[in-house]
Amino acid sequence: MIEGLQEMLKRDFNITFKDVDLLDAAFTHASYVNETPERKKKLKYYERIEFLGDAVMQLCVSEYIYEHYPEMPEGKMSRLRAAMVRADSFSKFAIECHFNEYIRLGKGEEKGNARQRPSLLCDIFESFIGALYLDQGKDEVVRFISKVIFPKLELGWFDHMMDNKTELQEVLQQNGECKIKYNEVNVTGPDNERVYTMNVVVNNEVMGEGTGRTKKAAEQMAAYQALKKLRK
């Protein structure tokens, strides 16, 4: 199983671990160790590495938000980071990376379909990040999540957790009823790489404009720009 994991990481992410035992531990569940008594003293499992991976993800995501959203208020930065490092987000990333296929489980956990359990998938994703950090450092972690996670911001992947449109509506309605409308301003790029520009109009006044890979993502950015304008 570890050989298949190494091949996948090299093929899909150009990652080659120097310490293969560390990678092995990152994908080993305690149930597997407990059911292998003759190797119990030698085998390690992921929980301590996961602890480190959680902290590394918090740092890397915080740095990315700080650098790429220089005018975002601290409160919104915290909400965005929370959305990006949620357990359900990590479990989806793990499946997207096919990590669930390489977890070493005990027979009982395997029968219980633990391989698809969101909490375990979240743990494995964090454990992989911790192992990658120990093996190759923070820069390699950033390179990996720049491929797996950060592009999802442009695609509006976290919109349901960071709803600028709803926040804008709530802020505006504090001062009474108002008419909010989102309009398509421009569309560029080929069919498979569309970039949309949308604006938000409040009582016939353009309050913000944003771009994104989907109309919904562009609308969220337009709402964010409108919120910035209102806070000035």
Curated annotation (Swiss-Prot):
Domain RNase III: 6-137
MF terms in GO: double-stranded RNA binding; metal ion binding; ribonuclease III activity; rRNA binding
EC code(s) of this entry: 3.1.26.3
Keyword tRNA processing carried by entry: yes
BP term (GO), one: tRNA processing
Residue intervals of the DRBM domain: 163-232
Gene Ontology CC: one annotated term: cytoplasm
Classification via Pfam families: dsrm (PF00035), Ribonucleas_3_3 (PF14622)
Known catalytic reactions: Endonucleolytic cleavage to 5'-phosphomonoester
InterPro entries cross-referenced by the UniProt entry: dsRBD_dom (IPR014720), RNase_III (IPR011907), RNase_III_dom (IPR000999), RNase_III_sf (IPR036389)
Cofactor(s) listed in the protein's UniProt record: Mg(2+)
Protein localization: Cytoplasm
CDD domains reported for this sequence: DSRM_RNAse_III_family, RIBOc
Alphabetical keyword list: Cytoplasm, Endonuclease, Hydrolase, Magnesium, Metal-binding, mRNA processing, Nuclease, RNA-binding, rRNA processing, rRNA-binding, tRNA processing
Highest taxon above the source species: Bacteria
Residues at the active site: D54, E126
Binding site for Mg(2+): E50, D123, E126
Homology family: Belongs to the ribonuclease III family.
NCBIfam families the record matches: RNaseIII
Protein role: Digests double-stranded RNA. Involved in the processing of primary rRNA transcript to yield the immediate precursors to the large and small rRNAs (23S and 16S). Processes some mRNAs, and tRNAs when they are encoded in the rRNA operon. Processes pre-crRNA and tracrRNA of type II CRISPR loci if present in the organism.
Protein name: Ribonuclease 3
Organism lineage: Bacteria, Bacillati, Bacillota, Bacilli, Lactobacillales
